[in-house]
Amino acid sequence: METNVNPLAVILVYFDSKGDRLLYRYPYQTLGQTEVANDEQRKSRKRNPYAVANTDDLLQTPTHLGAAKSQGQLQGFADEVLSALFAVKPQLCNQKFELKLNDVRFVSHPTLIPQKEQRSGPMAKQQMLINIVFALHAQASYSIVKCYHELSKRLGLALKFEEQRSGYLTEQTAQMARTHDEQQQQPLERTLELIAERCSLAQALRSIFHDLCTTGLLSTSLNHNLTLCFCLPAKAHQLHKKGSMVDPETIDRCLRALKPYHGMLLLVDFAELLDCVPPTGARMLWQLVDVYDPLISLQSMSSNADLSIEHVYKLVSHLVYWAKATIIYPLCETNVYVIAPDAPLHTKSHLVEKFSARFAGMSLFEVISDFSLPTSIGHLTTPLQQPARQGILAQMVIWMLQHHLLMQLHTYVQFMPSEDEFGDSASCSNHLRDAISDEEGDQEPDADELHGSMLSMSSHPLPVPAVLVGGHRREASEDHSSLASDNIAVQPSSSHKSNFSITASMSTDNCDSLDSMEDEQKLKELLQVFSDADRAAIRRIPASANVDDLSLLVKLYQMGYFKSEHHLEEIMYFENLRRSQLLQLLDKFRDVLIIYETEDPAIASMYNTK
């Protein structure tokens, strides 16, 4: 659930030689105040005489104590109790701390920080414990808990750095403790408000809490020196697709599948990109942004920006993690898109007005209706259209991709020969035999004509009938040879040149015969990679007699491209093939190859609603 992502509270606990103390918490509503008001309201109600008495086990802890209320605030815990719980022993410091009380889960990373050395006096360096605790719903997933622990760890390291640099933490904690002592007679809520006004650390914690509850993106400055950047993916990705719970593990799986032929699509304006990187990394990010184009691949952007492909991978991965960009295949005419099944296309969707404001005079429903069925961009454009019209269509497709209204379909290939090919071959053989017998009619062929291998029959597309010469019946082969010999005998051998031409043609026939024998041997070697059943199915395809076609088929088969795990764009990139060349091969061997279209599983998994 979305509510399980938001924190209930952020708590700052401090411990040194003087003891432990809860210095700050936010939200700072008085603990137990709401429970008292609710109890008084329940008592003031008129009791129903027919109400059933509560017979709950008295040994169980009442659920309202320490419960996370619907308002999303932590209530029912006293400051003294929380301070004693979170001021852990040194043995538990510098590691993950997790505690579950009723329906609240507390997550932190206690950090031991040595105090800055005093210049005067040989005093021994003292250590203090700082523990920034996040209160979460007990039902929060493991990935969410892991993210909050990482944030607590980073805050501890940042405060440790500032303490060693300028004594920042000692100054802030002393000011908080002094404010508590001065405001002992005041309500706790007023004391915490005054601390937030005086202490920059309290202001930073309050800002962190608000950012976690709204965008999930943090860019907080500590002591006006150190910038802390953090992203809560489960919250940040909901800004672009409401209801999508994206955890870091899913993003990592997607980014591990990143290839040079992929492209990048920014989801925000350029001005918002600097929020996700510290100032030291802004220069390299702008190098990539200057050459950004959704029409080119990451490899092309790497070359144009004069960056290595590894640096481009890291920058793109960072932008995807921070929900600033998404992975696509570069926009081109052959890309196939279809309406996303969970696209918010109801009549009152805010995207309708947003689309009309972006593209004046255009209707979102009218434009997106062209993608009701899987359609390529090339099918929606014609050569007669003006380039400006084609550019507007590309911009509209980009806009719909940014708002997750469209999804791209890729073509995958599965090698799957038919199981009844032998039966089909036998029926085809019987059909050919019946055709031969019907065509010859009541002619009585010799027994030798009805025998022969299937290969010899298939080599002759049409049966050659017997002919009558001089009232005697002869076989077609005999007649053919006799006619050939007669033709040679009739033609006068008037010159040596004619004899030489006959000899040359005979030598050419011999060379062709040798080439055909070599091709036949190579075909047999190529077919050895298949099983007997698959080999028989491939032999029935006419294209299997072509050495080049069969060689390419065997190569792609051995590389594992026909297991529904690689789409055509990936095959084209890694094997350096043209799309037309690959499509022709798939068409020639369509009897043993199944082709289907679906979205890329690695990219699609990021925005599956959970």
Curated annotation (Swiss-Prot):
Pfam families: HTH_NPRL3 (PF24064), NPR3 (PF03666). This is GATOR complex protein NPRL3. Belongs to the NPR3 family. It comes from Drosophila melanogaster. Component of the GATOR complex consisting of mio, Nup44A/Seh1, Im11, Nplr3, Nplr2, Wdr24, Wdr59 and Sec13. Within the GATOR complex, probable component of the GATOR1 subcomplex which is likely composed of Iml1, Nplr2 and Nplr3. Interacts with Nprl2. It comes from the Eukaryota. Disruption phenotype: A high percentage of mutants die as pupae or pharate adults. Under nutrient-replete conditions, larvae display a significant increase in TORC1 activity. Adult escapers display a small but significant increase in body weight and a reduction in climbing. Newly hatched males have a decreased tolerance to both complete starvation and amino acid starvation, likely due to decreased triacylglyceride (TAG) storage and the inability to down-regulate TORC1 activity and activate catabolic metabolism and autophagy. An essential component of the GATOR subcomplex GATOR1 which functions as an inhibitor of the amino acid-sensing branch of the TORC1 signaling pathway. The two GATOR subcomplexes, GATOR1 and GATOR2, regulate the TORC1 pathway in order to mediate metabolic homeostasis, female gametogenesis and the response to amino acid limitation and complete starvation. The gene is Nprl3. Keywords: Cell cycle, Cell division, Cytoplasm, Lysosome, Meiosis, Mitosis, Phosphoprotein. Residues 482-501 have a biased composition (Polar residues). Its main location: cytoplasm. One of its GO terms (cellular component) is autolysosome. One of its GO terms (biological process) is cellular response to starvation. The keyword Repressor does not apply. The keyword Protein transport does not apply. It is found in: Cytoplasm; Lysosome. The modification Phosphoserine is found at S437. Residues 474-501 are annotated as: Disordered.
